[in-house]
């Protein structure tokens, strides 16, 4: 018999704001988080994007992390996960499972150092590193897994979390995804010529492409 699966906590960070309640309120007001690029160091500012309205330094300070090198994917993920754990009231427990979806992980850090590589290596660049860093912040996970299947990464993480609970392998699973905008994203989709210079209009006769965004949930 399959175990029953219920959701006990949610955390959301997006271009609409920080927190599930803030995001819901913004959606109900009909707001859009798509606007001119502010934080991504790109020359292609003609393409509007959905950026989380905080710089990397502001995110670090909000999480009370010491000075250091942190990928934006890591920071967004921690912020969303903290809200979910606080809602579910399992923050003081141990032995939890974390399954996080991401496409490029800490690519923003890779791009920062690419012009002048550093002699000392950092385990921050592969997509699974951000999952481990998110887990390390809370020190309550003994099982981590990364799903990296492009746009379906976080959805596959949710599916895997559900299966782990239904099978009885895990009692509590935290599942979702985190992704930060990078030059890799913007340049890649620009090369495909599918980015819109205005807010996208997917069901309109004048549709001209998509807008990229970032966030965690």
Residue ranges and their predicted role:
Residues 1-143, 163, 182, 191-211, ...:
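Conserved "HGTGT" condensation-loop signature of ketosynthase/thiolase-family condensing enzymes
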Residues 144-148:
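Short catalytic-loop micro-motif centered on adjacent basic/acidic residues
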Residues 151:
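Glycine-rich, Trp-frequent "lid" loop and neighboring beta-strands that shape
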Residues 154:
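Short conserved active-site loop signatures built around small residues
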Residues 160:
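Internal active-site segments that recognize and position negatively charged phosphoryl groups
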Residues 170-171:
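Short, high-confidence coil segments that cap the C-terminus of an alpha-helix
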Residues 176:
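Conserved residues at the C-terminal ends of beta-strands
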Residues 179:
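Catalytic metal-binding/acid-base residues of hydrolase active sites
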């Amino acid at each position: 018999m399959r175990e029953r699966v219920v959701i006990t906590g949610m955390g959301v960070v997006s271009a609409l704001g920080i927190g599930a309640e803030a995001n819901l309120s913004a959606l109900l007001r009909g707001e859009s988080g798509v606007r001119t690029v502010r934080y991504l160091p790109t020359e292609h500012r003609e393409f509007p994007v959905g950026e989380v309205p905080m710089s990397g330094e502001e995110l670090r300070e909000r999480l009370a992390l010491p000075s250091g090198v942190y990928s934006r994917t890591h920071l967004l993920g921690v912020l969303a996960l903290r809200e979910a754990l606080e809602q579910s009231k399992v923050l003081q427990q141990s032995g939890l499972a974390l399954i996080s979806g991401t496409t490029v992980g800490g690519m923003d850090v890779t791009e920062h150092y690419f012009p002048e590589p550093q002699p000392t290596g950092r385990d921050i660049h592969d997509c699974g590193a951000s999952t481990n860093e998110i887990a390390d912040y809370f020190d309550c996970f003994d099982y981590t897994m990364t799903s990296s299947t492009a746009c379906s990464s976080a959805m596959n993480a949710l599916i895997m979390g559900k299966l782990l609970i239904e099978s009885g392998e895990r009692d509590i699973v935290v599942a979702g995804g985190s992704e930060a905008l990078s030059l890799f994203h913007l340049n890649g989709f620009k090369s495909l010529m599918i980015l819109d210079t205005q807010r996208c209009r997917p069901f309109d006769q004048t549709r001209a492409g998509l807008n990229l965004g970032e966030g965690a949930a």
